[in-house]
UniProtKB/Swiss-Prot annotation:
Entry keyword annotation includes Phosphoprotein: no
GO biological process terms, semicolon-separated: enterobacterial common antigen biosynthetic process
Name of the molecule in the record: UDP-N-acetyl-D-mannosaminuronic acid transferase
Function comment: Catalyzes the synthesis of Und-PP-GlcNAc-ManNAcA (Lipid II), the second lipid-linked intermediate involved in enterobacterial common antigen (ECA) synthesis.
Enzyme Commission no: 2.4.1.180
Organism encoding this protein: Escherichia coli O7:K1 (strain IAI39 / ExPEC)
């Protein structure tokens, strides 16, 4: 029988990733023995791997995060290629966030939300409360001034939040989480990018069949042709993968 409260780690280009078999494994790992882990969750996909390679500051930020997991199918395939016996699957960050919120609602875990447009954040709060009775102890949209950051950190600390999710895009959200943890270390932090927009229906996610086939990137490209430059950049990652430079 597999022990869901532990997980192996795998290394890709110097970055250590947690190998979760599936979503249930991820949740059992994060809530091991009924105790929510503390630290920072960072989703890793091919685009982020490239950014890490090119930006030393981002690499340092992400290396410092305790829980780095494979959010992109390309990263999962690379892990499986380098480690043929690895039982690792993609855990999409948006799905993990929803499952965490559902679990938090069930257990009464205090949650603080950061980021997003004011109206999107308000809709996110309402939906979380209505859908899972999430105990939201505070929130802040993404439109605050740099000089307001410290006061926000103090608000988060005073709220007693055990889960803090930050939707500011990378690397802003990783910088925010690193700095906030200096004031409020006893929590699980999660960078969630555009998840609030997807959750509230402002952004349409790829249909399940596209996700299952590992073609979510193609769906996004067809929906937003302006992404072509970003997608072409990923050819570099494919070269790493197919030449075994992992």
């Amino acid at each position: 029988m597999n022990n869901n409260t532990t997980a192996p780690t795998y290394t890709l280009r110097g970055l250590q990733l947690i190998g979760w078999r599936d979503m249930q494994h991820a949740l059992d790992y994060l809530f091991a023995d009924g105790q929510l882990k503390q630290g920072t969750l960072v989703a890793i996909n091919a685009e982020k791997m490239l950014t890490i390679e090119d930006n030393a500051e981002v690499r340092e930020l992400i290396n410092a995060a305790e829980f780095k997991y494979a959010d992109g199918i390309s990263v999962v395939r690379s892990v499986r290629k380098k480690y043929p016996q690895a039982q690792v699957s993609r855990v999409a960050g948006a799905d993990l966030w929803e499952e965490l919120m559902a679990r938090a609602g069930k257990e009464g875990t205090p949650v603080f939300l950061v980021g997003g447009k004011p109206e999107v954040l308000a809709q996110t709060e309402t939906k979380l409360r209505n859908q899972w009775n999430v105990n939201i102890v505070g929130s802040q949209d993404g439109y605050f001034k740099p000089e307001q950051r410290q006061a926000l950190f103090e608000r988060i600390h005073a709220s007693g939040a055990q889960i803090v999710t930050v939707a500011m895009g990378s690397p802003k959200q990783e910088i925010f989480m690193r700095d906030c943890r200096l004031v409020h270390p006893d929590a699980l932090y999660m960078g969630v990018g555009g998840t609030y927009d997807v959750f509230t229906g402002h952004v349409k996610r790829a249909p399940k069949i596209w996700q299952t086939l590992g073609l979510e990137w193609l769906y996004r490209l067809l929906s937003q042709p302006s992404r072509i430059k970003r997608q072409l950049r990923l050819l570099r990652y494919l070269r790493w993968h197919y030449t075994g430079n992992l």
